[in-house]
Amino acid sequence: LSAPDAKELIDWLTQQPLMYYDKRYHSILVHAGIAPAWDRVMALSHAKEVESVLQSDKIAGFLENMYGDEPSMWSEDLEGWERLRCITNHFTRMRYCDHDGKLNLTEKGSHAPEDCIPWYTAPHRKIDDLILFGHWASLVNQHENREVKPGIFALDTGCVWGKRLSALRLDENKFGNDRQLFSVKGYTKK
């Protein structure tokens, strides 16, 4: 927030989607995850709810009320700041949930507590599109090609800690139709 171009960066950031869907490649890009109870249409709609507040004069109130671990279970009956916080937590903080989809926002490691599962393994998950997500660098050593489950790629490879910055090429390329993972060394301030 003390950067000379902080206002410009914040203005740009508030204009970005919480969920990006590419129809051509049937692929979704999110920061952390998608609530298992949401299908693609619901997820896009819920992302737009938060985006519209971020791009409005209600942004200050949202930022004051955004942080918190509750509610931890999605319900269409949620309203106001609680609803927006729950949506935001799914898109930006989620790693683990229980079998019913209740968030566990305290666990951050690569091994789930006994009563939790990674969000992308939830048995009732409703999205079949390719999903790319970050936010979970501790998965870096568990899956060599970053595909944690068929069609789901964890792209956080620890760049913020001086490790690697990764991306997945989705389009057809000179090597054929196979997806290509690219990874470059990250930069850390000394």
Q: Predicted segment positions?
A:
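Active-site neighborhood of divalent metal-dependent phosphoester bond hydrolases
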Residues: 1-81
